[in-house]
Amino acid sequence: MGREYPLEKFRNIGIMAHIDAGKTTTTERILFYTGRTHKIGEVHEGQATMDWMAQEQERGITITSAATFCKWKGYAINIIDTPGHVDFTVEVERSLRVLDGAVTVLDAKSGVEPQTETVWRQADNYGVPRLVYVNKMDSTGADFYMCVNTLRDRLHCNAIPIQIPIGSESEFKGIVNLVKNEAIIYEDDLGTVMDEVEIPGDLKDEAEKYRTELIEAISELDEDIMMKYLEGEELTEEEIISAIRKGVISNKIVPVLCGSSYKNKGVQPMIDAVVDFMPSPLDIPPIKGTDPETGEETDRPADDNQPLSALAFKIATDPFVGKLAFTRIYSGIMKSGTYVYNSTKGKKERIARLVKMHSNRREEVDELRAGDLGAIVGLKDTTTGNTLCDEQNAVVLESMEFPEPVIHVAIEPKTKAGQEKMGIALSKLAEEDPTFKTHTDQETGQTIISGMGELHLEIIVDRLQREFKVECNVGKPQVAYKETIRKTVKAEGKFVRQSGGHGQYGHCWIEMSPSEEGYSFENAIVGGTIPKEYISPIDEGIKQASETGTVAGYPAINFKVKLYDGSYHDVDSSEMAFKIAASMAFKNAMSKADPVLLEPMMRVEVTVPEEYMGDVIGDINSRRGRIEGMDPRAGAQVIRSFVPLSEMFGYATVLRSRTQGRGVYSMTFDHYEEVPKSIQEKITGEKK
């Protein structure tokens, strides 16, 4: 089977934006106009084709990146519709890694919003070329020119309008195409009847101004155009398109378009712009990887005749076929029914079937070729970020990095029978989502789930109930405190019991002192005051007793013990008696050694725009945080600090409201530190 579309006619794009800017509606319209759907799905009616999880249809937001394939004027377009909510940033990150271009959707009345900044930064990291579509031009307060200014001011990009609107708010009825220098007026509700007319008289000056701006912007990128422009020659449409394309692919300019997806205006010209200006797989540099044998860097050009290289960028569970591995093919051909080598894990896997996805509908195909996006059925060991390749020409592509979870809660099934079911379900969900983690707390025995925010974990619990039929109780997160000592003391432990027949006798003296890290035990017994066989039980007894300290019953850490004296009884002494004596000695010693409570300190980095810095620093200080330093980063500041974990619960929500959603933070465990006296008293009071 040959290639249906040549590689230069391929476009792999993502649609990204702030929540509620109209991404999913825009994608629905693209599918309608390219003939993929015969009925338009409305998000607010819960019918959108791309929002296929029950939670998405209920909440009207996109949680997972739905992938779909469509055709337009002889071009093949793969589209990924990504979520705009900050808790689902991982989905955006995954998509950008495998896309060649992106359409950023703005709300015409809001311009650049917080999550727009976040996804823009992510796209910058991957060098993804972009164009901007200003949506909702029909809504009250719509302002196209304000949007262009926010792009320039807040994202520091070279935003160049290639269209301007005809009218706005309820009067919005079409666009001026600055490339063709003509107007498009929409005549019907479905947007399929358009009239290409002369630019209205009252817009001629405005159109001339922005067309000149466009020509000047592209002439700076192309010497031939510069010469023609300076000599006053008229540029052809082809020359302008070619120059804009060059500027977009090199990330030097960002074309700005406008429309109203809901009112079916401006969508087809936007699809034209995707075809005209977005790169094909041949326009972007070959994917880089490492040879697993030699460790040398190698690259794989987009070509069917090259050895196979592909990246699994998302794992999803399909109710009918099981595990789906969404994959981008960078080079070579992947065939159904063959084996593929997972070079990340060093394992061979069999491809049962290959499918192209249309949201959650599958179309089976025999092969996927360079540039394709598709899903594989049958891979057992492959996880997000794994490389799939030809075993004889192995390569490991650069994997994806995901942020650590920032919020944790305890969860338990409502019934005993649900325990095993919940374990299986959680491991499946963790396989799908690299930012969702689950573990069992060794101290409380509780199952702890961790994720990117409250909404993220809500959706996880919701999916447990809907997809896996596991009803759960969700608790509040708890902090794992520890205890330690501050001075060296000596203490005795003596266990004597006479109750007819055999008695019990164990007796020891220990010296307990603070230590830098962990626990150590030294046997300093001389002259056999305690026989050798009882030394190990004494060590064991101390270790067991240290699991519940004397301050508030939390585990004791960072101390050392020297066993230096004691006594025994020929008949009554036993291992158990010495174990009990040792635990008594530990309790006596710890209570005299100035014991204190320790709390986990988190290394917290907050990235915020300058104007919110004072507010955020004040908030960190109020949480008993210590500011370690600040670094400037692309129009923002990174505040580095240490903050107690107990003070960080609910921080994501607070930061979001204090910075209008423009602040982001990361949090990792760093070390344990002494709890202030007043807080210690409060915690011990609660424990009692």
Curated annotation (Swiss-Prot):
Residues 8-282 form the tr-type G domain. It is found in: Cytoplasm. It comes from the Bacteria. Residues 282-305 are annotated as: Disordered. One of its GO terms (molecular function) is GTP binding. Keywords: Cytoplasm, Elongation factor, GTP-binding, Nucleotide-binding, Protein biosynthesis. GTP binds at residues 17-24, 81-85, 135-138. Catalyzes the GTP-dependent ribosomal translocation step during translation elongation. During this step, the ribosome changes from the pre-translocational (PRE) to the post-translocational (POST) state as the newly formed A-site-bound peptidyl-tRNA and P-site-bound deacylated tRNA move to the P and E sites, respectively. Catalyzes the coordinated movement of the two tRNA molecules, the mRNA and conformational changes in the ribosome. This is Elongation factor G. It comes from Clostridium kluyveri (strain ATCC 8527 / DSM 555 / NBRC 12016 / NCIMB 10680 / K1).
